[in-house]
């Protein structure tokens, strides 16, 4: 027979079962009728055993705890002479159990509240961010100064990324291209954009390593001639190439 830990009526453990029994009796959790609760709990465990279900050990531990508390409460009170100067309140055998039940109840209520909030949140849908670059003319955010080291770092990262994505077998064909030709190509790409602006790596798509180097040198020359500028909105953010001058009008 396949063994299984029972989970009747979605009880997650002995404390969950006890809360259910206390709720059925409609009694105060701070004044649990131990005899009645223990009898009902033991009846539940015995029923599971009769059905030949594998009762989880934690249920058996709780059964022993309940029987111990019940026994203590059934013991006759000893009649002693009372010294009112040293009188202390007698500890209730149920105190530790009540404390555990209250703590479990708080966690259960918190879990229920979180689940409700999760269900409520599922009705909300986030809208993907929009590219508003073409609308930001006149409200341009201050850019950080981009150094040659920043550009070299971005260029090296792009080279490594393209090397990882390179096919295992490639046929190399030489194609000479001048820096002037590549400068015109870069300006042409920028001219095609509404705001004359492109992300740095978009200028280097589908090029050989030699072409990448020529494009990078062309970009530096365009910056020197003040035909383009390279911008960065924040440290470690993407670099953007912004066209300038009459060539783009």
From Swiss-Prot:
InterPro entries: ScpA (IPR003768), ScpA-like_C (IPR023093). One of its GO terms (biological process) is chromosome segregation. It is found in: Cytoplasm. Keywords: Cell cycle, Cell division, Chromosome partition, Cytoplasm. It holds the Pfam family SMC_ScpA. Transmembrane segments: none annotated. Gene3D superfamilies: 6.10.250.2410, Structural maintenance of chromosome 1. Chain E. Component of a cohesin-like complex composed of ScpA, ScpB and the Smc homodimer, in which ScpA and ScpB bind to the head domain of Smc. The presence of the three proteins is required for the association of the complex with DNA. Belongs to the ScpA family. Participates in chromosomal partition during cell division. May act via the formation of a condensin-like complex containing Smc and ScpB that pull DNA away from mid-cell into both cell halves. This is Segregation and condensation protein A. It comes from Listeria innocua serovar 6a (strain ATCC BAA-680 / CLIP 11262). The lineage of its organism: Bacteria, Bacillati, Bacillota, Bacilli, Bacillales. The gene is scpA.
């Amino acid at each position: 027979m396949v063994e299984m830990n029972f989970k009747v009526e979605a009880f997650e453990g002995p404390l969950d079962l006890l809360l259910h029994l206390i709720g059925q009796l409609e009694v105060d959790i701070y004044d649990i009728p131990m005899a009645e609760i223990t009898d009902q709990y033991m009846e539940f465990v015995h029923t599971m055993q009769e059905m030949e279900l594998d009762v989880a050990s934690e249920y058996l531990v709780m059964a022993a705890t309940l029987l111990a508390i019940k026994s203590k409460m059934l013991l006759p009170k000893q009649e002693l002479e009372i010294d009112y100067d040293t009188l202390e309140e007698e500890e209730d055998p149920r105190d530790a159990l009540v404390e555990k039940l209250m703590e479990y109840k708080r966690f259960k209520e918190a879990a229920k509240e979180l689940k409700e909030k999760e269900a409520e949140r599922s009705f909300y849908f986030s809208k993907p961010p929009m590219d508003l670059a073409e609308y930001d003319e006149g409200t341009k955010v201050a850019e950080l100064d981009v150094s040659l080291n920043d550009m070299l770092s971005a260029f090296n990262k792009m080279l490594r990324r393209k090397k990882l994505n390179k096919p295992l077998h490639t046929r190399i064909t030489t194609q000479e291209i001048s820096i002037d030709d590549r400068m015109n190509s870069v300006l042409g790409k920028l001219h095609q954009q509404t705001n004359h602006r492109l992300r740095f790596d978009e200028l280097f798509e589908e090029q050989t390593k030699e072409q990448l180097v020529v494009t990078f040198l062309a970009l530096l020359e365009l910056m020197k001639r003040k035909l383009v500028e390279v911008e960065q909105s924040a440290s470690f953010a993407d670099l953007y190439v912004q066209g300038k001058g009459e060539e783009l009008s």
